[in-house]
Amino acid sequence: MESCEVPRVKICGITNIEDALHASACGADALGFVFYPGSPRFVDPEQTRRIIAELPPMLTTVGLFVNQSPARIREMVEFCGLNTVQLHGKEEPDQCSYPPCRVIKALRLKDGMDESVFSAYRVSALLLDAYVPDKFGGTGQCCDWTRATEIASRHRVILAGGLNPENVSDAVRQVRPYGVDVSSGVEKRPGQKDPEKVATFIRMARELF
């Protein structure tokens, strides 16, 4: 499913309204909110709800969950006003349905993963991230772009892992993903975005188009 369209851009790890509104104003298509307590970018549901209430109506809001119960995920979706669920844990293919929300399944690329792993997930998109033991994203490590290119030719792929304003244009040129996802690559510190880096990342992600 190789993409020839302008890649969608998701800014993940949003924790405050200032970063959210700036990313939106710069043209981000989606914002990600991390509900994994082990992350330095964790944001509580009340704060997320307040942020989302201030956002433009056509912006995609994504909740990132790691091995949380379906009941808890549904509760958070309704309370916060999320419209997309991103599953970043060990969820099996039959655990990835949360209608009416769209679902993104994150997979950390490692040796031995064959096509059956990717085709088993009937989700809106696959997010490809770097494999780092005991880490669920936000590591700043790049995934294998060559492998990602192969997967993106067959599936709707959001490329993540180690992206930043300096390399995102090359990543888009090689992989041709449906979208790109960044968190640590546009930060001053974990949980606080660098406005200039956010603006540059979004511009460079679309440079080829």
Q: Can you annotate each of these PLM segments?
A:
Residues M1-F209:
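Conserved N-terminal beta1-alpha1 strand-loop-helix module at the mouth
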